UniProtKB/Swiss-Prot annotation:
A biological-process GO annotation: cell wall organization
GO molecular function: glycosyltransferase activity
Quaternary structure annotation from Swiss-Prot or TrEMBL: Homohexamer in solution.
Pfam families noted in UniProt: Glyco_hydro_130
Reactions catalysed: [(1->4)-beta-D-mannosyl](n) + phosphate = [(1->4)-beta-D-mannosyl](n-1) + alpha-D-mannose 1-phosphate
Note: Both RaMP1 (Rumal_0852) and RaMP2 catalyze the phosphorolysis of a beta-1,4-mannosidic linkage at the non-reducing end of a substrate, but acceptor specificities are clearly different.
Job of this protein: Catalyzes the phosphorolysis of beta-1,4-mannooligosaccharides to mannose 1-phosphate (Man1P) and shorter mannooligosaccharides. Can also catalyze the phosphorolysis of 4-O-beta-D-mannopyranosyl-D-glucopyranose (Man-Glc), but shows higher activity toward longer mannooligosaccharides. Involved in a mannan catabolic pathway which feeds into glycolysis.
Keywords linked to the UniProt accession: Carbohydrate metabolism, Cell wall biogenesis/degradation, Glycosyltransferase, Transferase
Name used for this protein in its record: Beta-1,4-mannooligosaccharide phosphorylase
pH-activity dependence text: Optimum pH is 6.5.
Enzyme class: transferase
């Protein structure tokens, strides 16, 4: 590999398919998509925009937190496990959070939860998601050690905010999180910001990262999976939204941020890397959506498996390599 993965883990059983000979793109889809259908659970209307991580990686296992909209159309979070990263056993019961502190018992009454991300930092798995506070969207924060018991902490920010994504280690001694301040509705605007915290409770030192730039992302953007630390900087996938005559179109691309000051953009791909083109991405509860929430990365080979929600209905997977995507972002950068 030309680009080194920093603080990565070996994943010899990472889900993988070689790039098709006729593929001209830097990211290619799994040929058996979607990997999680909308009706995998008896109560599910849809399962999408979900996050997975290596879990007991020495045993080749994976775990995740899944967005499940039930048949009452409640937005819930469920835990799940897999032996291969493709076939998932999702708990039919939603996560019921225990409170990390007694002071949050009254505040953290469950309303809804969606679009989770999962990030391993130091000794535990941190979960962030769009959480209801007074039925207004903000960033919920919780942690787990085993994906069976989850401890909910203070919300990170005031409403209205979405797309809370943690960095996988402290930077300059502080936890770092992406977010996208928003409004109460289907946000018609949005820039990405970074906030910092000494303790995962009090967040400040907010820094603007970037806003919409090109036509494919001209309406709003938001952070996607957990950033990948490389020798070039932080490799970050993010989604961008075009407002067309037929509604919103959600695509995704990538950028590379400075390693020590991650609010500084070194490279930003001018083009989308994957957009809704397959039937399962274009047709569903919300048409024309590809929404990445997680990656698995093998430090030995540089292989990346990307998990993304499709049409707010199901979960699919795509592939690339660190070298391929870094080279492409650098050679097609708009900054």
């Amino acid at each position: 590999m030309k680009t080194q993965i920093i603080n990565g883990v070996s994943l010899p059983n990472i889900p993988w398919q070689d790039k098709p000979a006729d593929c001209k793109d830097v990211i290619w889809r799994y040929d058996a998509n979607p990997i999680i259908p909308r009706d995998q659970l008896p109560t599910s209307n849809s399962i999408f925009n979900s996050a997975v991580v290596p879990y007991e990686s020495e045993k080749g296992k994976f775990a995740g937190v899944f967005r499940v909209d039930d048949k009452c159309r409640n937005m819930e979070l469920h835990a799940g496990f897999s032996k291969d990263g493709i076939h998932w056993d999702i708990n039919p019961d939603r996560i019921v959070f225990e409170q990390a502190e007694k002071s949050t018992e009254e505040v953290n009454q469950w309303g809804y939860g969606y679009d989770p991300r999962v990030c391993f930092i130091e000794d535990r798995f941190w979960v962030t998601w769009c959480n209801a506070y007074g039925w207004k969207p903000t960033i919920g924060v919780a942690y787990t050690f085993d994906f069976k018991t989850f401890y909910q902490c203070e919300n990170a920010f005031l409403p209205f905010n979405r797309n809370g994504v943690l960095f996988p280690r402290k930077i300059n001694g502080k936890y770092v999180m992406f977010s996208r301040p928003s409004d109460s509705g289907h946000t018609p605007f949005g820039d990405m910001f970074i906030s910092q915290s000494p303790d995962m409770k009090y967040w400040g030192e907010h820094r603007h990262v970037m806003g919409p730039l090109r036509a494919w992302e001209s309406k709003k953007i938001g952070a996607g999976p957990i950033p990948i630390e490389t020798s070039e900087g932080w490799l970050c996938f993010y989604h961008g939204v075009l407002e067309s005559c037929n509604g919103f179109v959600y695509s995704f691309s990538a950028c590379i941020l400075d390693k020590d000051e991650p609010w500084k953009v070194k490279y930003r791909c001018a083009e989308y890397l994957l957009s809704p083109q397959k039937i399962y991405e274009c047709v569903g509860d919300v048409q024309n959506v590809t929404f990445p929430c997680a990656t698995l990365v093998d430090a030995d080979t540089g292989r990346i498996a990307i998990y993304y929600g499709c049409a707010d209905t199901c979960v699919s997977m795509a592939f690339t390599t660190v070298d391929d995507v870094v080279d492409y972002v650098k050679s097609h950068s708009s900054v």
